[in-house]
Amino acid sequence: MKHLILSGCAGRMGRMLESLIEQRDDCRIAAGVDPAPYHSEEFPVYSNWERCPPNADGILDFSSPAGLSPMLEFATGHGIPVVLG
């Protein structure tokens, strides 16, 4: 099973991806990152990358352009592959 971090989880695409991933058996959301207040029953949500643990197989990014640099710094620093949306 792949563990994913969902960047931009509070946005429209983030919420859609959350609902689609919840239906799958081969992956799960390990954490979400979004500066907007958001609560999920399924995974912890962090307001910034400094708080997010790096225990993931990949990052799905549907955040705003302003969130791209911190996310890429986190991903490259921890060797985590990224899918940009």
Where are these regions (language model features)?
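Extreme N-terminal starter segment of soluble prokaryotic enzymes
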Residues: 1-5
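Conserved Rossmann-like nucleotide-cofactor binding loop
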Residues: 12, 38, 65
